[in-house]
A protein has these predicted regions:
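Bacterial N-terminal signal peptides
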Residues: 1-6
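Alpha-helical cap/lid subdomain in secreted, periplasmic
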Residues: 38, 45-48, 64-178
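Serine-esterase "nucleophile elbow" of acetyl-processing enzymes
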Residues: 10-58, 66-76
Length: 178
């Protein structure tokens, strides 16, 4: 995905919009320790001329993301990472609403020809198996529908490790971001 963007011989740095919630915004972390600066550093270290735009808003839901997407795309964007839905699940919002909002976000990005990496989320266990069965298929279903790349669980390898999470047990530490 990223390699293909770099191969297009652009004169300017590839601009990736990291569009999400507090996990994207780096909630509770010092400046420079969050996901966006860590991703940009890693990609640059691998030789990619890239700028990662911080489109993270703490507390945001898929509805909030949909409402602010056009504004967030005001600058030139060559690709997008969409990481939304955790707050929908934490609030127990209906999974069908999260699905509809993410579907609309991916549709708008596709209409602009912006390739997407969709970062999946998991529902909290306390919401039960019915909620989980409705929520968790959203990401693979929509990635397939919109021909987006899928990272199945944004917090993979981090969520279950208390040492990689802040005291709230939800947000990664600087080490967890890595």
């Amino acid at each position: 995905w990223f390699i293909a963007l770099g191969a297009s011989a652009q004169a300017e740095a590839v601009r990736i919009l990291a569009f999400g919630d507090s996990l994207t915004a780096g909630y509770g972390l010092a400046q420079g320790e969050g996901f966006v600066p860590a991703l940009e550093r890693e990609l640059r270290a691998r030789g990619h001329d890239v700028t990662v735009i911080d489109g993270g808003v703490s507390g945001d839901t898929t509805a909030g993301g949909l409402a602010r997407l056009d504004w967030s795309l005001g600058e030139r964007v060559d690709a997008a990472i969409v990481e939304l839905g955790a707050n929908d699940a934490l609030r127990g919002l209906p999974p069908e609403e999260a699905r509809a909002n993410l579907d609309a976000i991916l549709e708008k990005l596709a209409d602009r020809g912006i390739p997407v990496l969709l970062a999946g989320m998991r529902s909290p266990p306390n919401l039960g198996p019915e909620y989980r069965a409705a929520f968790e298929p959203i990401y693979p279903d929509l990635a397939e529908k919109h021909d987006a790349l899928l990272y199945p669980f944004f917090l993979d390898g981090v969520a279950a490790d208390a040492s990689l999470n802040q005291p709230d047990g939800i947000h990664p530490t600087a080490e967890g971001v890595q």
